[in-house]
Amino acid sequence: MLQDPEAYWNAKHPQQDILYEGRPVPGRIKRVDWDIRRFIWHDDAILKTVLYQHVFLGTSNPMLGRSGDLVARDIQEFVVDHLKYVGDEKAQGVEEFWLFPTETYILKQGDCEDGAIMIASFLLNAGIAPWRVRVSAGWVKPSPTAPQGGHGYCCYCRETDNQWVVLDWCYNQDSHKDVSEKPLLKERDDYADVWFSFNHLYAWSHSGFAMAGRVKEKETDT
């Protein structure tokens, strides 16, 4: 086990400001730059109400008497059941449109990164430590012979061993598995190189990748 996992994981990759043309402003078509950290809402009354009323059924403090791993599994399962995958071009009429988490909840649909951002935001509002939560954007490869595609997904550093697992909702999702039984992210072949990752505090660049293009649509795994 790591001596200081929070310090280790926060320093594992270079921290830097990352701007992304995630969405246009109202009344415009052209997307504008956003600080990607601003898409994750860590302390929001609406999200806390959703957790209280619909995820943890009247429990105002989900972490009371429950492990973070169990909370994470319940949140992943809720998002998988609640959201329908709809690509940005079909839903918004534009190539890329990142939603804020309450928008995703109200619409009950979104692209891959929308659900990932909502999962991350729910985790933080439930009381999970920020260093255990991040959204990653990078390549995925469904099979050895399949082409790579861009994808956004939520990662969680589980309490079991302070290692990262994926809490996906629309690509190879495994919400039926306990977090302690999920395969480690570093051992998965279906998740490839990461371009960048972020939570509401920090953004990290990975593997010297220069981000290009967009987080592409991924079809819902059935």
Task: Indicate where each model-derived feature is located.
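A structural boundary/capping signal
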Residues: 1-222
